[in-house]
Amino acid sequence: MPGYDPNNIFAKILRGELPSYKVYEDDKAFAFLDIMPRAPGHTLILPKAPARNILDVNPDDLAHVMKVAQKIAQAAMKAFDAEGITVQQFNESAGGQVVFHLHVHVIPRHAGVALKAPASFKEAPDVLAAHAERLKAAL
């Protein structure tokens, strides 16, 4: 398995080198909206510590990321009147991972509404900003 690349896009977001639609932050985790959401409110939660994926993350950091994912899921249920939540996490290329910094997807769901294809649609900035505010208000 290759090592962690400190120049991956999520590492740059964590360092403030790239913008994001932040939803939540604490000393160990950061959550922000996916700019190519599969559904409104699609949020990514990642550890601040360098970790390529579940195979090399510190177990305490992984546990904390999942606690934050639960908070985001609860907020998303309220903020988007969701009927359910999809949680996804991919590891290595063969497992579907595209950005090699551990991250968990939390996606609000509604019955009968299919998810958009991955990376198929870039949401408008004003919509993302409004969705981030809805989630923050529900936390």
Where are these regions (language model features)?
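HIT superfamily nucleotide-processing domains
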Residues: 1-139
